Amino acid sequence: TNREWLLVKRPQGLPQRSDYEWREGPARAPGEGEVVVRVLYIAMDPAIRGWMDPSGNYFTPIPLGSPVTAVVLGPVVESRDPRLPVGTMVCGLGSWSDYATAPGLFFNPVVDADQHDLVAFLHPLGPVGLTAHYGLFDRAGMKKGDAVLVSGATGGVGSLVAQMARLGGASKVVGIAGGPVKCRQAVEVFGY
């Protein structure tokens, strides 16, 4: 049995329980090039809210009546993708469900899964951490001694950018956050 949350209505403002529907049924069998992943962890990233909008934000919008899209982590339990055999621990784009069926290209194998806490692959070692690293070092070209300004300093990506900048030898790291509570968090928790 697969339990999953479907998006049935586009949220207006903060999502409400009535925007979702709970469904139980069999997991969809994988098609050619697809895998079924038993979802162990779901990243509850703020980006999901944008994917619920008709514009999809920077991503294809979640179709109404479909499972809510999210970054998930778990083992492959069925595979029609030779790159991801059954038993491979993966992280990628799945859904709010017990089992996510999706193209194998949506997932990457988790390397050295036995050497790290698995949830780390959803944040610092996963898409959020890769985004922070790519933005800071590949796009911005940060070098030792640079001063770094981080917008969205208390968010998932921003908080990691700040830590990477400090560890990378930035001379100064300054964070921008929305409001006194987030600014206090930036200083007291993230050490700006």
Language-model segments: what does each one mean?
Residues P26-M44, M52-W96:
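Glycine-rich beta-strand-centered segment in the early N-terminal region that forms part
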